[in-house]
From Swiss-Prot:
Post-translational changes noted in the entry: Ubiquitinated by TRAF6.
Cofactor: Mg(2+); Mn(2+)
Compositional bias segments (type: Low complexity): 9-26
Binding site for Mg(2+): 132, 162
Organism, scientific name: Mus musculus (Mouse)
Description of how the protein assembles with itself and partners: Interacts with TRAF2, TRAF3, TRAF5, TRAF6, TNFRSF8/CD30, TNFRSF5/CD40, TNFRSF1B/TNF-R75, ETS1, ETS2, FLI1, SMAD3 and ACVR1B/ALK4.
Function: DNA repair enzyme that can remove a variety of covalent adducts from DNA through hydrolysis of a 5'-phosphodiester bond, giving rise to DNA with a free 5' phosphate. Catalyzes the hydrolysis of dead-end complexes between DNA and the topoisomerase 2 (TOP2) active site tyrosine residue. The 5'-tyrosyl DNA phosphodiesterase activity can enable the repair of TOP2-induced DNA double-strand breaks/DSBs without the need for nuclease activity, creating a 'clean' DSB with 5'-phosphate termini that are ready for ligation.
UniProt crosslink position (Glycyl lysine isopeptide (Lys-Gly) (interchain with G-Cter in SUMO2)): 34
Chief place of localization: nucleus
Catalytic site: 272 (proton donor/acceptor)
Other noteworthy facts: Can partially complement the absence of Tdp1 due to its weak 3'-tyrosyl DNA phosphodiesterase activity.
UniProt protein name: Tyrosyl-DNA phosphodiesterase 2
EC number: 3.1.4.-
Organismal lineage: Eukaryota, Metazoa, Chordata, Craniata, Vertebrata
Length: 370
């Protein structure tokens, strides 16, 4: 203990100290078990292998998913210990490939030889989406559904939440026209995808939320787009009504970080905030120079609710709830960034009878005024 009396320092060794630490130890062990179960599920989905065999290969590779996947796929073909399908179990006849293998496919931007943008830098587009990687049901088909949206809209930037390691590995393989920056490497996390040849990555920073119970943080990425400097941010703020106080603390951290960027830098935050409107009011509202894109556009009804259990039955919740959990905040020099449109994506059911996620994604287009 850094400070305090000797009696304070000795307290944890007594019965009261042991009793106080027991719940924390139990919670830590429960979290560890949950993370490893999640790793096993994701590994089995990607590897197309018997789930009962997964823990052993992960243990042999220190529970490092990427290392374990590499070791697994490099096993000799005559090794009968791991009956498996071809390396990517996501693949099917209806598979949507984001690697732009078809030379005639113009939906994915390829980097230009000169390194200059291939499109008008006065307009930028992005998608923010909680892709619900924690739901293992129909995950391969749902991942293809998300990728088909990326191929269709070809956004400059993609903000993702609830990404798991196998999903990230899949994106790195299939979304080869994007640079992927993640907020973590284990459990579940956020990610920001930057279109190569269009968005130049400069640096990244991860801001921890010290009191989170759900592995949440703030991912910040500094980029250059069309000669303009941007600070891109995403987060998945604490979930559920019971964690409102922590969510408000996290929102204050986000807004504070948005104010730290130089005045000449445009700041965009997009993510799953889990916010209720009254929580923004409790936080003191948005700063005068930070705007909510949906409110800026006149609060259009067609894209108000991004989590709607009546329209989206992925969670099979009998009651009907709808919230504007997914939000976009921006800070720019006056008049230099103007939202033009905001739409929901991922609205079509897949062949499996489910949507790509329990959240709708948000597609936003903005004009950059020099």
């Amino acid at each position: 203990m850094a400070s305090g009396s000797s009696s304070d320092a000795a307290e944890p060794a007594g019965p009261a100290g042991r009793a106080a630490s027991a719940p924390e130890a139990a919670q830590a062990e429960e979290d560890r078990v949950k993370r490893r179960r999640l790793q096993c599920l994701g590994f089995a989905l990607v590897g197309g292998c018997d789930p009962t065999m997964v823990p052993s290969v992960l243990r042999e590779n220190d529970w490092q998913t990427q290392k374990a996947l590499s070791a697994y796929f490099e096993l000799p073909e005559n090794d009968q210990g791991w009956p498996r399908q071809p390396p990517t179990s996501f693949k099917s006849e209806a598979y949507v490939d984001l690697t732009n293998e078809d030379a005639n496919d113009t939906t994915i931007l390829e980097a230009s030889p000169s390194g200059t943008p291939l499109e008008d830098s006065s307009t930028i587009s992005f998608i923010t989406w909680n892709i619900d990687g924690l739901d293992g049901c129909n995950l391969p088909e749902r991942a293809r559904g998300v990728c088909s949206c990326l191929a269709l809209y070809s956004p400059d930037v993609v903000f993702l939440q609830e990404v798991i390691p196998p999903y990230c590995a899949y994106l790195k393989k299939r979304a080869a026209s994007y640079t992927i920056i993640t907020g973590n490497e284990e459990g579940y996390f956020t990610a920001i995808l930057l279109k190569k040849g269009r968005v130049k990555f400069k640096s990244q920073e991860i801001i921890p939320f010290p009191n989170t119970k759900m592995m949440r943080n703030l991912l910040c990425v500094n980029v250059s787009l069309g000669g303009n400097e941007f600070c891109l941010m995403t987060s998945h703020l604490e979930s559920t009504r019971e964690h409102s106080a922590e969510r408000i603390r996290q929102l204050k951290t986000v807004l504070g970080k948005m104010q730290e960027a130089p005045d000449s830098t445009t700041v965009i935050f997009a993510g799953d905030t889990n916010l209720r409107d009254q929580e923004v009011i409790k936080c003191g509202g948005l700063p005068d120079n930070v705007f909510d894109a949906w409110e800026f556009l006149g609060k259009p009804k067609h894209c108000q609710y991004t989590w709607d259990t009546k329209a989206n039955n992925n969670l099979r919740i009998p009651a009907a709830y709808k919230h504007r959990f997914d939000r976009i905040f921006f800070r720019a020099e006056e008049g230099h960034l103007i939202p033009q449109s905001l739409d929901l994506v991922g609205l079509e059911k897949l062949d499996c009878g489910r949507f790509p996620s329990d959240h709708w994604g948000l597609l936003c287009t903005l004009n950059v005024v020099l």
